[in-house]
């Protein structure tokens, strides 16, 4: 017998920007992504602090917590000190329905 995976996409037309850090913000974004929202995680160039907690295989790998909290997300890095970064953030925020920051 075959089972079809049930997917709840109640938030399929919602765009979320995730500037969250560590557990609370990223977890919120993951839950919204689970419900079908388009979630975009914005990180600094070197990566968020939570990216390297408990690496899977080696010191340079991404941690299991990071992978779990960032499922169903698109990602981008941004250098806030570079000219033009504020314009990019402004455009992203104008296109978003939800902004996560903690």
Residue ranges and their predicted role:
Residues 2-102:
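N-terminal helix-loop segment corresponding to the beta1-alpha1 unit
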């Amino acid at each position: 017998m075959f089972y079809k995976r049930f997917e709840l996409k109640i938030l399929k037309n919602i765009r979320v920007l995730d500037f969250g850090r560590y557990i609370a913000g990223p977890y919120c974004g993951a839950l919204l992504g689970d419900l079908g929202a388009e979630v975009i995680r914005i990180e600094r160039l070197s990566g968020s602090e939570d990216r390297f907690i408990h690496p899977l295989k080696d010191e340079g790998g991404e941690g299991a917590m990071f992978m779990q909290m960032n499922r169903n997300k698109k990602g981008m890095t941004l250098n806030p000190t570079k000219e033009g970064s504020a314009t990019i953030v402004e455009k992203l925020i104008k296109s978003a329905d939800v902004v996560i920051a903690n």
